[in-house]
């Protein structure tokens, strides 16, 4: 009996790293029970997680990453808080994974073809950067946080967990439609998607929606209408904001090299950001009631016409094309036009501004019409200034 237990101990020491406890006597099936309150990591390439002499019962964090021979999860712990089988190139099914796991990771798996037999009680599930998975069928239906970002093979969201609170399918190179996306999700991320052409079937109840960095998305039609925070920065294909959610509290379409007009921008958003835009020539159609407005770093903006008039914070610093402040918001409390290389005059500056920044100017010669009641005024490094 002692020899059998010693074989179990030696097997674990040879193939696993971490602390573990082996029962003193075998169970009714004649096998020793092994548990761990810490992290137990598989460190050798073996075809089976256990030997015929023992079983895993409960492990806090079980890690069998990067195994190149493991074809089955049979013998995995019955219960685990975290279960990680990422990087496996031989595993084709999740059968045998602990059913009561809280967090499950199978990231960068190149052999997993189905999520059937996945543990249905997982709170968090990650199958990111999978090159073999074509469908989400089998995903735990009640999972709260689900991530399948960077998937090279996923063609449909069929089987996606409909009750997920956070859903991330970003950096997907094969997904063309959001059909079957979880409808009641709170936060939805599909940024850096190289294949998504339409937001049709996007979840309409999302509080946060992020589709930034999309190189295929041409329209915002189908975007969630009641979203609070909407992000589509670095989108290289978006030409119009038509279809944008009109009730978003925060809207960010900065660094878009293709957007030429703000027509369709949500009018009642509180915080609007179109900074770094390389194609925007006018603010016409911009949100008229925004409290914070950022158009800094614009290389194409020539006029502030259309800027929200009652904005509190206005930022157009590092603007390389703006020549005049005519049309600038009149009620701004904070106004920043520092490092503007093209601005020639301060005519049009808001008169009630409290904090005004025009540091780093190289072109202005006069500060005519400068604000008179400000608390802070900074025009350091204004090399071309000759007259105050």
Positions of predicted regions on the chain:
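LRR N-terminal entry segment and analogous cap-like coil->beta motifs
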Residues: 15-88, 101, 290
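Ankyrin-repeat-protein effector appendages
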Residues: 387-388
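Catalytic phosphate/metal-binding cores of nucleic-acid and nucleotide-processing enzymes, i.e., regions
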Residues: 2-24, 42-47, 358, 379, ...
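Thr-biased low-complexity repeat/linker tracts and other Thr-enriched repetitive architectures
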Residues: 69-368, 372
């Amino acid at each position: 009996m002692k020899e059998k237990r010693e074989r179990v101990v030696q097997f674990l020491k040879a193939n696993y790293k971490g602390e573990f406890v082996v029962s003193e006597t075998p169970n009714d099936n004649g096998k020793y029970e092994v548990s761990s309150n810490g992290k137990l990591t598989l460190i050798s390439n073996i075809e089976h997680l256990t030997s015929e002499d023992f079983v895993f019962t409960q492990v806090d964090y079980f890690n069998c990453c990067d195994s190149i021979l493991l074809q089955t999860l049979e013998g995995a712990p019955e219960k685990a808080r975290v279960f990680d089988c990422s990087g496996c190139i031989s595993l084709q099914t999740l059968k045998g994974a602990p059913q009561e796991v809280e967090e499950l990771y199978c990231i960068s798996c190149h052999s997993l073809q189905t999520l059937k037999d996945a543990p249905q009680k997982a709170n968090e599930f990650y199958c990111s950067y999978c090159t073999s998975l074509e469908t989400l069928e089998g995903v735990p239906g009640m999972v709260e946080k689900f991530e399948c970002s960077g998937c090279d093979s996923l063609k449909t969201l069929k089987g996606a967990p409909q009750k997920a609170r956070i859903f991330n399918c970003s950096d997907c190179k094969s997904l063309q439609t959001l059909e079957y996306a979880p409808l009641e999700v709170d936060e939805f991320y599909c940024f850096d998607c190289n294949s998504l052409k339409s937001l049709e079937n996007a979840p309409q109840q999302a509080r946060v929606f992020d589709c930034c960095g999309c190189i295929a998305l041409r329209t915002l039609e189908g975007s969630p209408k009641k979203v609070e925070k909407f992000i589509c920065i670095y989108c290289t294909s978006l030409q119009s904001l038509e279809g944008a959610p009109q009730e978003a509290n925060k809207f960010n379409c900065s660094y878009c090299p293709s957007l030429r007009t703000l027509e369709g921008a949500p009018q009642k958003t509180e915080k609007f950001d179109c900074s770094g835009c390389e194609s925007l020539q006018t603010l016409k159609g911009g949100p008229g009631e925004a409290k914070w407005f950022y158009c800094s770093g614009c290389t194409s903006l020539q006029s502030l016409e259309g800027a929200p008039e009652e904005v509190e914070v206005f930022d157009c610093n590092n603007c390389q094309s703006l020549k005049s402040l005519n049309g600038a918001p009149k009620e701004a409390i904070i106004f920043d036009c520092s490092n503007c290389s093209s601005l020639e005059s301060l005519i049009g500056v808001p008169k009630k501004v409290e904090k005004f920044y025009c540091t780093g100017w190289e072109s202005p010669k006069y500060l005519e019409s400068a604000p008179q009641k400000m608390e802070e005024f900074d025009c350091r490094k204004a090399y071309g200034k000759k007259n105050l």
